[in-house]
């Protein structure tokens, strides 16, 4: 337990709203809305869970005021008002306030929409022709449909790059009017606030980099911010009862001093604009990173890419210039960090985005001092999903996105549960079983908890993964869970319980090629565990997650590295927000990347392999090296169940469902423990 928070839990007045604390859920695109953009049961359950956890202010991200093809919420017609009223009513039950972040995508929505509808109409005609046996018309209409669709995609791609400069004043006026109309609908639905999405189209117009217009919306600073101020005025006129917040996108600096982002404003201009926003009647300003680079990791950076609280310096500057509340967002992962920011007067409100997905009870736990499950900033379940237009989730929170159907159930009587293995799956199983009221003992054969997480934390930028293990080390004693280290569980240990969960993980494997038994061959797991220290040239066999991370680890320790990968891509499955960092590291250190290459032998000089060329031919490859590091996957560990008489469930890697995946380990463990 830690000391309860004080500053975070203080109420604050924001315009017409009284927020019960300083904890905010910032806008994140969830993908949970219905296909027509309305708020359905999945969205309601997700946002209600946040409100029930004590969050005072929730912002629904990327709400479109027009019917776009974009997979986001939409409040474009009066018919959608009832679902947003249901959202407001649901959140209000728990004392929270809710805002809609209104945005417009950077493209000609009607134009693209007409093309998409034309493609669909041609496809429908094709199917009708096929049903009538008219193959000639079917082929012609399908070709027409595909051609129109390709034209729509081409226009969409073009507009995303150039719409800011090509949009007519009439189009901009129509967009502004649509945003205002959506705000009026939000007010009618009982929504509490509107957040102006200062990025996207609005931010592009503000940007000296992207805005090349020569009319009243381009050129000078005053012209570039003109449209944003007009949007604010239109919203305030259309929905005078609502609090109006502005998400202020700023081009921050990378650790090396280079600018980060294109849309939005430079810090000095952002500070000047903040004063104009206050003069325009804005009730609150959220200082955030500008987007428009094509990679969500630039806006929501993964672990190790940017410092903690990385946007705070600009937020602090803005706060010194305005009298309205200022929110900060960006890698604030702990209650203690939020408290310190508020105590220092650097901001007024703390936006916990990914952190609240990981643990929606941050506010409740801040009041009691109970440890929170801190976000890893891995971006695997959340930001990658936003990037790829999928449902977001959190690798550590098995309930994420399924709050309507999943919750820890009360236990069924007094039961003793034996958990074999203290890796991440075993620890999650122990937590859930203990939460259900069961008497839980964890048996771990080694002298520490964490299993493969300890290895995963060894490569550069990955040490934050250890927060997952540290959470269990903090919380399990308070739940009454007994942990026995250096104890290899026996059948007697399991039989002393009423049921057992086996989470003994997996072990790495070696490709059985000539020379695989050479002394120069080492395991990637042993490298990451620090059991072997390599120097000179290393050939890493396997370019998946473990292989690429091992390669980075070796680079950090001064080795020259080559990677041999059978697939046509290095680091398949890695977070798309982390991958650019890895590739940059490889380029800087001249890492050889041999894709579509199969290991055939290990020799005294190095390794021999076969590379499949683009035309399908096979060519021999020889790579000189001092060491060969095997990173070719893992195999589930076996656990001897002879003599075990109680029910046993295998979870995590040893279940065979999927290896080397923290999300799968957590989810299999959660569900197994919840069914005991």
Label for each model-derived stretch:
Residues 285, 318, 341, 353, ...:
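Hydrophobic, well-ordered secondary-structure elements that form the walls
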Residues 439-479, 551-599, 655-658:
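Rossmann-like dinucleotide-binding cores of NAD(P)H-dependent redox enzymes
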Residues 411-445, 484-492, 496, 503-513, ...:
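Rossmann-like dinucleotide/flavin-binding elements
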Residues 26, 101, 196-199, 247-249, ...:
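Generic beta-strand/beta-sheet core signal
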Residues 1-420, 424, 428-435, 439-440, ...:
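Flavin-dependent oxidoreductase catalytic cores
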Residues 95, 241, 323, 346-347, ...:
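A generic structural signal for alpha->beta connector loops
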Residues 10-12, 44-45, 271-272, 313-315, ...:
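A generic local structural motif
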